[in-house]
């Protein structure tokens, strides 16, 4: 059996007893024996912290006769992997492929020369004495002109297709929205100027009469079906002399493009400002030049000190990109993480490992002095002792609070969850209660209200 899932569904484990079948608890089937986690670098920060708590439950539920499921996690951008793996899975790790004796030949991968397999070429642009908007307009117009000039020179369709669609990467939806307007107006005006005035005697023949404004965006504002159609259908339309009007001129994207976009024909990208993390920069720019040579132009904002620093250190930075990948942070048993997820871990293990606590109406059967319940407590304590021993004392105290609260709640009628007025153990994520439980992990950050006082 092959199961495809996302980590945000982990939040359903304490809320529902049906997933017990996936672990072979309610049937005679075996639990999962192999877990493949793609894009490990994304399981970091608040999401990774909460995932680490639920992974403690999944690790135990997949265990049979002391043997845990094997985990294979893949990523191209990670640093301090040992700590991340320990915090996320509670295990040591083995890196594959190993470094080998030579960085150029590890047996599993061999370094190729630019002549053998051309890759991406990076350029940095920073306008001095002009605004970042003007610089971005001029760079986009120059890219548009250059790619269209390939067609004018009569290059094969396959070569032109590789650079026809220009991908724009933006750090915020606000910047992306502004660029969308600029492409329809300012970029086209600048393109006309380049074709009819500045380059008319040097690079003649570029036709700008029809305009190149076929633009699509790839952001969280799109629905799942729209995103699928863009990636699987529209982006894969190849350029020919007869159908160029049906091929995107621009693809404007947020950080969504960093994952899951594998379109070989994309070969040109304009990056508007240095992304927030180096891992994000590597992942985003690797979307172009995957099958053919690629060109990435990073447009820096001179008014931002971080952008200026990257521009000044451009050669050094790009000669060792992976050296600057940030270490990820996971703290699954920190104070705020325990507030939001420790009870979910405890309840999940109680429901799945103790038969008379499994059903929705069986929450009332809980007794903290039950030997099976005490085994669950020991499982969690042993896990925390291995993953984050500094938090062990605090975890033990909070487990005692959770047990006392469940003991008190179990004195009357009690269910795990209910949409009716029944007394329920697991409360909604917005309720102010010890047992408030997330329904999904798509939004794991806590929120704080800000009140402005008059006269300030």
Tell me the role of every PLM-derived stretch.
Residues 257-273, 294-298:
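A short beta-strand element within the Helicase C-terminal
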């Amino acid at each position: 059996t092959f199961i495809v899932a996302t980590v945000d569904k982990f939040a359903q484990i304490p809320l529902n007893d049906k997933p017990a079948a996936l672990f072979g608890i309610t049937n005679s089937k075996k639990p999962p024996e192999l877990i493949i986690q793609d894009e490990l670098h994304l399981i970091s920060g608040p999401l990774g912290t909460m995932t680490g708590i639920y992974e403690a439950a999944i690790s135990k539920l997949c265990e049979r006769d002391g043997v845990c499921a094997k985990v294979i996690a893949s990523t191209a951008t990670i640093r301090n992997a040992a700590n991340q793996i320990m915090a996320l899975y509670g295990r040591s790790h083995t890196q594959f492929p190993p470094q080998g004796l030579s960085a150029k030949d590890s047996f599993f991968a061999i370094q190729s020369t630019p002549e053998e397999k051309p890759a991406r070429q990076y350029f940095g642009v920073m306008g001095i004495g002009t605004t970042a908007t003007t610089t971005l307009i001029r760079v986009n117009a120059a890219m548009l002109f250059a790619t269209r000039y390939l067609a004018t020179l009569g290059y094969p369709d396959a070569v032109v297709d590789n650079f026809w669609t220009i991908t724009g990467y933006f750090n915020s939806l606000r910047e992306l929205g502004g660029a969308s307007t600029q492409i329809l107006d300012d970029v086209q005006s600048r393109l006309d100027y380049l074709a009819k005035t500045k380059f008319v005697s040097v690079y003649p023949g570029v036709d700008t009469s029809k305009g190149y404004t076929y633009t699509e965006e790839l952001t969280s504002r799109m629905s799942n079906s729209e995103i699928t159609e863009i990636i699987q259908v529209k982006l894969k339309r190849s350029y020919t002399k007869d159908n160029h009007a049906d091929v995107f001129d621009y693809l404007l994207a947020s950080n969504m493009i960093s994952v899951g976009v594998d379109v070989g024909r994309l070969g040109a990208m304009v990056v508007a400002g240095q992304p927030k993390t180096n891992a994000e920069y590597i992942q985003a720019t690797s979307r172009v030049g995957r099958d053919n040579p690629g060109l990435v132009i990073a447009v820096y904002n001179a008014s931002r000190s971080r952008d200026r620093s990257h521009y000044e250190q451009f050669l050094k930075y790009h000669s060792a990109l992976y050296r600057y990948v940030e270490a990820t942070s996971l703290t699954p048993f920190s104070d705020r993480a325990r507030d939001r997820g420790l009870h979910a871990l405890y309840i999940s293990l109680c429901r799945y490992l103790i038969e008379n606590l499994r059903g929705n109406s069986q929450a009332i059967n809980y007794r903290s002095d039950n030997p099976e319940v005490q085994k669950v407590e020991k499982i969690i304590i042993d896990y925390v002792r291995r993953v984050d021993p500094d938090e062990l004392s605090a975890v033990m105290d909070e487990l005692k609070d959770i047990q006392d609260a469940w003991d008190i709640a179990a004195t009357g009628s009690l269910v795990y969850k209910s949409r009716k007025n029944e007394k329920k153990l697991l409360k909604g994520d917005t309720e102010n209660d010890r047992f408030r439980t997330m329904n999904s992990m798509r939004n794991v950050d806590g929120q704080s209200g800000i009140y402005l006082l008059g006269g300030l």
